[in-house]
Amino acid sequence: MAPQLLLCLILTFLWSLPEAESNVFLKSKEANRFLQRTKRSNSLFEEFRPGNIERECIEEKCSKEEAREIFKDNEKTEAFWNVYVDGDQCSSNPCHYGGTCKDGIGSYTCTCLPNYEGKNCEHLLFKSCRFFNGNCWHFCKPVQNDTQCSCAESYRLGDDGHSCVAEGDFSCGRNIKARNKREASLPDFVQSQNATLLKKSDNPSPDIRIINGMDCKLGECPWQAVLLDKEGDVFCGGTILSPIYVLTAAHCITQSKHISVVVGEIDISRKETRHLLSVDKAYVHTKFVLATYDYDIAIIQLKTPIQFSENVVPACLPTADFANQVLMKQDFGIISGFGHTRSGGQTSNTLKVVTIPYVDRHTCMLSSDFRITPNMFCAGYDTLPRDACQGDSGGPHITAYRDTHFITGIISWGEGCAKKGKYGVYTKVSNFIPWIKAVMRKHQPSTESSTGRL
């Protein structure tokens, strides 16, 4: 009787199951109306799928072993894991003087360049002008096992022995307006600009112009001078060195018997506002060769001094060592002028400025059909359709270092206009520092400093 009772109970239970299921469980379509859940990457046979860093370690927390399975490389795994655990300790760039940072868990490690040590590469083993200019803001001079810093004219050495402090409102090489107004846009400006030079015949052409440059805003190129002929037309450029001296190219002096100088202008067409400065004398380097443009340098002495302001400031004159070892090893220089904006066109009414890279001497010499003498250097791009041609000869090639702008070259000559594989050729100012100083010292009026307010 007991076995029969047990069998009846089992049959009764099985008979009731479909009804229970219909009461407890909902159909899939109906259930989805109530249970809204975002699908994850997890699914059937997930462990058999290839590793995915987003699925394993971002959507979910992963282990180091899971990360290793994804990267399949110990070095990559360590680099990822150190950042994954507690963030990137190198994001603040803690390593000084070019040191390389490697992230760790709760720490970082700096690999220092030669001659530097310390957790952040902050200590010099021994001072040398060859390493980061001896930490000098301007000029560095080796003294036994140490270095001695000094500054350009119109600056004094700071109390720290490294920095240079401007002594006047219009100290050389200061470009306050450009730094304040366009600091954020400078990287695009640097990356997007280019200059190469023009050849009109089989000889190097002294006629230079800037093509596709940006407008130089008022006060952004304060050292720019422009040379006008008897008719008041632009034919060359120049660089303000002092209240009465303007640096230019020697071949510019041979182009016109009558020369006037204008400074502080960004729109040369506004004749009612421009003030013409008369030339007293012009000093052309005695070794200048018109056929080759070697020694293409000259200094103009004005009859009346320039009145400095926020928009009119001289460029700083570097030492030869500083120019060769520091300035000309920077990535870019800056040229400016009122030259033509297209081949065969008219000179520009507005001042244009272009940032161009230095070109190594070997590449420079290979690119030219003419001799590149030791008194010349190349700058510019070899392919981009941006150029420097007629009208800007004699103008400035400026290089900035620690917010001070130094004259490094004079726009001289070139081959082709936006011609592939050709660069602009510039007079190398560092070769002529003693000559420039000698001319200025020999002919300097006693009233220059007070009138020019250096």
Curated annotation (Swiss-Prot):
Signal sequence, start to end: 1-20
Subcellular location: Secreted
GO cellular component term, pick one: extracellular region
Residue ranges of domain Peptidase S1 in the record: 210-441
Sequence ranges assigned to domain Gla in this UniProt record: 41-86
Reactions catalysed: Selective cleavage of Arg-|-Thr and then Arg-|-Ile bonds in prothrombin to form thrombin
EC number in record: 3.4.21.6
Glycosylation sites: 92
GO biological process: blood coagulation; induction of blood coagulation in another organism; proteolysis; venom-mediated blood coagulation
Enzyme active site: 251 (charge relay system), 296 (charge relay system), 393 (charge relay system)
Enzyme class: hydrolase
Keyword annotations: Blood coagulation cascade activating toxin, Calcium, Cleavage on pair of basic residues, Disulfide bond, EGF-like domain, Gamma-carboxyglutamic acid, Glycoprotein, Hemostasis impairing toxin, Hydrolase, Protease, Prothrombin activator, Repeat, Secreted, Serine protease, Signal, Toxin
Example GO molecular function: serine-type endopeptidase activity
Maturation and modification: The vitamin K-dependent, enzymatic carboxylation of some glutamate residues allows the modified protein to bind calcium.
Domain of life: Eukaryota
Main location class: secreted
Database matches in InterPro entries: Coagulation_fac-like_Gla_dom, EGF-like_Ca-bd_dom, EGF-like_dom, EGF-type_Asp/Asn_hydroxyl_site, EGF_Ca-bd_CS, GLA-like_dom_SF, GLA_domain, Growth_fac_rcpt_cys_sf
Job description of the protein: Snake prothrombin activator that attacks the hemostatic system of prey. This protein is functionally similar to blood coagulation factor Xa.
Subunit structure: Heterodimer of a light chain and a heavy chain; disulfide-linked.
Name of the protein this chain belongs to: Venom prothrombin activator porpharin-D
Organism this protein belongs to: Pseudechis porphyriacus
Taxonomic lineage from the root: Eukaryota, Metazoa, Chordata, Craniata, Vertebrata
